[in-house]
Amino acid sequence: MKRAIVSVTNDLATDNRVARTCAVLQDLGHEVLLVGRKLPGSLPLERPYRTKRMRLLFNNGPLFYAEYNLRLFFLLLFSRCTLLVSNDLDTLLANFLAARLRGKQLVYDTHEFYTEVPELVERPRVRAVWLAIERRIFPKLKHVITVNQSIANAYRERYGNEVQVVRNIPAPRELPPAPERAALDLPEGKRILVMQGAGINVQRGAEEAVLAMRELPDCLLLIIGGGDAWPVLERLARERGLQDRVHLLGKMPYARMMDYTRNADLGLTLDKDTNLNYRFSLPNKLFDYLHAGIPVLATDLPEVAAIVRGRDCGVVLPAADPAAIAEAVRALFADPERYAALRGNAIFAARELDGGKEAAKLRSILEGLG
């Protein structure tokens, strides 16, 4: 019996990329165990494979990463398995050591350009530790996957490895019809903007989106998810008196989130070009907006802008500036004909950008392993 252990440091509830990996492995005949962590606010989890969410003494900082990797290492060392799948650099050390000691195959899926995230770029000593781990292990890896070609090229240039690309395009999901706005306590007479994501962190444009609402009295901004910018967003909305224009909804199951997104008029992805990770990012939310049939307002980052411009499914801004965001929103809603065209193009783009093709590519990479 083929057995795969898939590990990630989040709480498993909203990581659609990891869920897809587990589904593909299960379809290939693996018995799957997905390992993550349990947080106080973690949503309930129901999956057709085994899951383990570890309760840790530490929830952040170096002690969290040390505790998680130590516990993960011993779990991997003594659990029956034929294949290990490591998601992101913060699980790689435990997976690499266990794979080496046990002679097991290892797949590394890096969801971002990890050592270039702003949280590390702004803390050189911490970044040096992660970079040392990456430099020691990455050149030895045989099976590496990432989320887009820009990041694949950057890793190939840095380490020489061949890196496969599987984009974060969601597989088509059968969702029930979207509820009416009233059922979600949303106003009928306002244009609704949405920004969603599990990583609504600093430098991702959420603060600027909130400030833009000062100039958009006829709009409502929904921010769905979580991240380290959340307390800042709450404070901004409160201090600027924008609670009636900005609703922070927190994390929720995917289907519920898409109920809100499908009731929105415009999706926001406003990452700043302040670090290589954000520059090369291709966030899940872009594809969720397209699957919801709504146009996109995006910053001019290569991977995102290539889709928005190439599919003519939204508006690209030079940078995430509150005044520019507000002006773009006003201009878009003032031109019903242009808005309708962008909305139609978003629906067409969702059909063309087929998550099933990405799942098939992942299957071809994993087939024969373990």
Model-inferred region functions:
Residues 70-78, 93, 97-101, 108, ...:
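Membrane-proximal helix-turn-helix segments that form the acceptor-binding/catalytic region
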Residues 324, 331, 338-352:
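A short, well-ordered alpha-helix in the C-terminal region of glycosyltransferases
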Residues 6-7, 145, 187-214, 222, ...:
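Conserved donor-binding/catalytic core segment of Leloir-type glycosyltransferases
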Residues 266-269, 288-298:
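Short hydrophobic beta-strand element within catalytic cores of glycosyltransferases
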Residues 310-311, 315-322, 331-337:
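Conserved acidic donor-binding segment of nucleotide-sugar-dependent glycosyltransferases
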Residues 43, 125, 175-187:
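A short helix/loop element that forms part of the nucleotide-sugar donor recognition site in Leloir-type
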